[in-house]
């Protein structure tokens, strides 16, 4: 339980929070999804490694707003250093009296790609195999141990403190191409300066490369990119001016997802990229649905 100072509670803005808050009075849970398993994504690791306090402060604010009785921080198995940092910092919160013991529990992930899906994450938190649940009911209605559970991403709670301090108008003042806000892009591939790039929502990949990544590596020509990691699809360089945001890529059969931008050059065979992605999904499919269970294997065998 958080030791809450008396103050007015802002109204949650997300639809999931609204569903969560409408549930009957009683214990409610909150989970932070730190299972950063999408290929090419590393922004959560960067933020937690450089400023874990901001993340934890945002977590406490979010838990206070939705009146959560307990919070699980579910971290990727491949991030043992981050797990150690968070557990040490949570102990400090307890010692200083900011939270009661066991209010925040850092859980080590199961190492499976599918556990990044919120209902599979809930199953894993409960000690079960990480398999997506049938919905409805949604996790905001029936989550951890059957209790209403709100699932947030790491980046969502990471920005809460700054938005509280500077106001929503500050955050919404950023954006391009009729989009609003900031996005954290995990940029990798054949650029001079890869890494986590905080850029306006709606920026195009061409502007992202030139303004934030120093351009392409010398001797490399930009030919294609992954706008949303392994599951987000592949787009040619001829479509490099599309705004990057949550609802701008569907017409091209792609989506931004976790904003993992992988830049591909003319030194790489696109067929090899596609084959590598199919091998990844062949290995990581949870096997629940036939197209995903059998499709990647068929694609790999066709290559």
Give residue spans per PLM region.
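Short amphipathic, charge-patterned alpha-helical segments
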Residues: 58-60, 202-217
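Hydrophobic alpha-helical positions that pack around
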Residues: 26, 83-201, 213
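Short alpha-helix boundary/capping segments
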Residues: 43-54, 152, 197-200, 281
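Short loop-to-beta-strand transition segments
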Residues: 215-229
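Active-site loop ensemble at the mouth of alpha/beta enzyme cores that anchors a bound cofactor
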Residues: 124-136, 238-255
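Single conserved hydrophobic/aromatic residue that forms the stacking wall/gate
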Residues: 1-16, 20
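Iron-sulfur-cluster electron-transfer modules
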Residues: 14-129
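Ferredoxin-type iron-sulfur electron-transfer modules in oxidoreductases and energy-metabolism complexes
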Residues: 26, 34, 45-46, 70-71, ...
